[in-house]
């Protein structure tokens, strides 16, 4: 009996080891594919004013001055954002020089890592390869993820650190795993070094709301392990404490007061201050997967399991949080894309099984995205759009005309056509569009 048990245990250990190896290979493979996808054409995109140039110029001065602690622009200390994005940009500049490619490398890297991490976490939580892989594919081909993974802003890095913050917290709470809760707090610490206090405050609020929705007191108690709090402070205190020691109240007043509290209480862009702002933005951000995502949210409403509630609180709690903030900005709700895309990945199972309505909704999302890009080609006449038109024609033919024949290829068609269209845009129209922005936007000095 003992011998049989030992054989069974050895077999289970071998299977577990093989599964870990397979997971690692998948992680690396999807990271490389996503990284090349996001990196393609980045060298064609000039740095635009004023937002991108502020980050790029600050990082350049960091390299040239040798002061990697205090961000500054034109010799003036700059407290707009924490240090993380400047460190990544400075490392890229140190390795590749002050080029457009180096400027966009950190966002491409963060976007690819986000895709790979989402696949890893969903495989870990759901034990479902199909859902996890399609979640990664859908995230990479969603409109906002593709755009932000090419932009010189903080949001790509914020998403990268928010994924382990939220998903490790879910694992830590549901499985009572101290290790994953420490990872979650470490992710929150890195997010605070990227975007500021919101990197901890928003995930914390979302997790507390989710724990309350579970109606289980022990989940709340598990949320605050001392080891996690220690990990958080070990990560954030060196820079925040160092900045206060060097700059004193100027840092506190400008960083926390002007760039955090004031933006939350006083609108920086009054023309965008509408309650429905993010309700319009989220579906557009998710294209071509928006309708599949919302359909799956509705279909799973009656289940209301732990992971469903977690994703709903994450998605709509983020939208509510930023709706209540005075300043509205197109990238603020970016982290809501991850739970919404996860719902779309659940919907992928229905499309793969040939269900009619999810397949129609997937095609509708593709049609809207292609229509928007098609309209853009008439505004940007400098590019050669023949390849894009061929991609569009193939998409219409494969998805609509050969509807029944391609029943089990619909997901592949949507993702392939979307990815191809994005690559056409970055090779032809987007560089011309950004050059126009460069000459019509105000200088960061203004």
Regions found by a protein language model. Name each.
Residues 2-3, 406:
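Intrinsically disordered, low-complexity coil/linker segments enriched for acidic/polar
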Residues 104, 445-446:
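Short, cationic motifs built from Arg/Lys/His that form the positively charged side of catalytic pockets
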Residues 10, 16, 436:
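Alpha-helical and His/Cys-centered functional microenvironments
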Residues 182, 299-441, 445:
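Membrane-embedded architecture of ER/inner-membrane glycosylation machinery
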Residues 3-7, 15-357:
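Membrane-integral, polyisoprenol-dependent glycosyltransferases
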């Amino acid at each position: 009996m003992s011998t049989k048990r030992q054989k069974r245990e050895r077999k289970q250990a071998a299977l577990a080891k093989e599964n870990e190896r397979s997971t690692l290979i998948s992680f690396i493979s999807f990271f490389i594919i996503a990284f090349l996808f996001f990196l393609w054409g980045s060298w064609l995109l000039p740095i635009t004013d004023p937002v991108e140039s502020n980050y790029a110029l600050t990082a350049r001065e960091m390299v040239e001055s040798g002061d990697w602690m205090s961000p500054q622009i034109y010799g003036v200390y700059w407290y707009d954002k924490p240090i993380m994005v400047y460190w990544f940009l400075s490392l890229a500049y140190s390795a590749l020089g002050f080029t457009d490619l180096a400027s966009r490398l950190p966002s491409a890297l963060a976007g690819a890592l986000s895709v790979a991490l989402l696949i890893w976490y969903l495989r870990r939580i759901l034990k479902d390869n199909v859902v996890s892989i399609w979640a990664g594919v859908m995230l990479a081909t969603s409109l906002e993820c593709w755009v932000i993974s090419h932009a010189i802003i903080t949001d790509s890095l914020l998403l990268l650190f928010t994924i382990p913050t939220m998903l490790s917290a879910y694992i830590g709470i549901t499985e009572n795993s101290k290790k994953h809760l420490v990872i979650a707090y470490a992710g929150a610490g890195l997010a605070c070094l990227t975007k500021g206090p919101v990197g901890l405050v928003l995930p914390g609020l979302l997790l507390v709301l989710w724990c309350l929705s579970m109606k289980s007191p022990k989940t709340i108690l598990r949320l605050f392990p001392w080891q996690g709090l220690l990990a958080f402070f070990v990560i954030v205190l060196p820079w925040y404490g160092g900045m206060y020691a060097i700059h004193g109240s100027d840092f506190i007043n400008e960083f926390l007061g002007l760039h955090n509290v004031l933006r939350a209480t006083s609108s920086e862009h009054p023309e965008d201050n509408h309650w429905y702002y993010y309700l319009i933005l989220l579906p557009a951000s998710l294209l071509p997967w928006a309708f599949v995502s919302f359909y799956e949210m509705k279909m799973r409403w009656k289940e209301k399991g732990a992971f469903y509630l977690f994703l709903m609180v994450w998605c709509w709690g983020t939208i509510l949080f930023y709706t209540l903030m005075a300043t509205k900005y197109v990238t603020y709700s970016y982290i809501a894309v991850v739970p919404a895309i996860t719902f779309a990945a659940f919907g992928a199972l229905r499309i793969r099984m040939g269900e009619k309505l999810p397949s129609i909704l997937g095609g509708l999302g593709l049609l809207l995205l292609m229509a928007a890009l098609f309209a853009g080609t008439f505004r940007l006449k400098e590019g050669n759009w023949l390849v894009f038109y061929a991609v569009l024609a193939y998409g219409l033919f494969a998805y609509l005309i050969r509807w029944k024949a391609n029943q089990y290829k619909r997901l592949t068609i949507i993702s392939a056509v979307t990815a191809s269209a994005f690559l056409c845009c970055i090779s032809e129209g987007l560089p011309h569009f950004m050059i126009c922005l460069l000459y019509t936007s105000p200088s960061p000095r203004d």
